[in-house]
Amino acid sequence: MRRYSGNACSILVRLAFSHKAPSSVMPKIISDSLWELAAAEVQHQESEEETVSERTVFLMGSKAGGKTSILLRCLERDEAPKPTLALEYTFGRRARGHNTPKDIAHLWELGGGTSLSDLVQIPITSVSVSCLSVILVLDLSKPNDLWVTMEKLLQAVQTQVDKVFSQAAQAHKSKPGTKNQQFVHPAARVLPKDYPDRELISPFPVPLLIIGSKYDLFQDFDSEKKKVVSKTLRFIAHYHAASLIFTSIKSESLMSKIKSFFSHLAFGLDRGKTLSSDLNKALIIPAGSDSFSQIGPPSVTDVDITSLHAKNPKDLWRKVYEHVFPHENASEQKELKDPSKDPQYSEPQIDAMRAQKDQELEQYKKNAAKSWKGLELET
C-alpha cells in the first residue's frame, strides 16, 4: 500500500481540480498519475527546503553615518560599534524552519565614506553579483556632504557591476556558436511593465536601499531645508528604482522597519507594506510605490530653476540641492586615522616591539645625520 504525507494529500486535492485527462484514460490510471504528480511536487518542495540560499549585501555610505550600528541592530548583536577602517566582512544566518539548513547572508561594509570607493571590486564579483543587494546609508545631519557621497558611491558600484556584466558577456561570446547572440546577464534587473515612470527612470543594476540615518538630529532642522533633503532623496530613490527609509538608532519603531527591509534583502523575507511619504515624518517608501507626479518639482524659492541650465532632470535636482546645501569637502579630504595608534586595536607585545623598532630607527637617523655632518666638516 502506498503511503503519502499530508502535504501530498493536500496537493493531490489541488491537482484533482486542475488536472485534465483524456476520457479514454481509466480512472485508476488518472489516480496513479495524480499521486505521482503530487509526490513529485512534495519532493520538489523538500529539495528546495534543503537547499541553502546565499545572498550578498553591501553596505556603504557617509563616513561615521551609523552603518555599523544599523548592521549590528539588524543582526541583533549586542556589541559596541567600532569605526570601520576599510572594508569589513561578517555574515548572518537564518533558518527557514525546524530542522532545515540555515540561509546565509554575506555582509560587507565599506568604511571611510568615499575615500575607499575603489574597494567595491572586492565584494562585487562575478559570483556575488547574481544575488547582490546594496544599502546606501546617508547621514541626514550632514546634508552638505550628502549629494557628493551618494553620487560617488553609487557610481563606483555601477561601474563595477557594469564591468562584471561586460566580462560575462565577453565570456559568453567566446563560446562556439554564440558570437552573434545578444547576451543578457541573468542577474540584470528587469522592472515590471507597470512600474511607475518606467520609461523615465534609470534603475540601479541591483536592488538598492537608501537609508537616511540620524533622523533624530535631522527632524530639528528648518522645515524648508528638511523639505529639500526629503524631496531630493525621494527623487533619487525613485529615479534608481530604490527603496527609501529614514531611521534613527534611538527609535525602536523606525529600527524595526529597517530590520524588515534588511531581512528582505539578506534572506528574501517580506519587507512589509508600510508606506510613509509625509515630509514631516520619517519617510518609508518601498521601491515602486512612488512617482514623479507625487514627488513634484524641486523645492526652491530663491532661485529661478530655468536659469540653472540643467542637462537632465537629475542634474536639475543636483543644482537645486547644491544651491541650498553647497558641498563642504573638508571632511572628505581628511585621511583615515592611523589604525596602529588606535587604542581599540592595541596588541601589547606587537606594540612594544613596534615602539622598540621606532626608537632604533630614530637612533639610526641621528647617527646617520652625525656621520654626514662629519663628512661635510672634513671636506
Model-derived features: where do they sit?
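Short, flexible boundary segments at extreme N-termini or domain junctions of P-loop NTPases and their
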Residues: 1-62, 91-95, 104, 116-117
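Switch I (effector-binding) loop of TRAFAC-class P-loop GTPase G-domains
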Residues: 42-44, 48-50, 75-106, 113-118, ...
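Short coil/turn segments at secondary-structure boundaries
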Residues: 46, 50, 70-76, 82-87, ...
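Glycine-rich phosphate-binding P-loop
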Residues: 55-75
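Inter-motif core of Ras-like GTPase G domains
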Residues: 118-143, 147-167, 179-182
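G-domain G4 guanine-recognition motif of GTPases
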Residues: 137-142, 165-188, 195-224, 244-256, ...
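Canonical P-loop GTPase G-domain recognition
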Residues: 218-290
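Extended non-globular C-terminal regions
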Residues: 302, 306-379
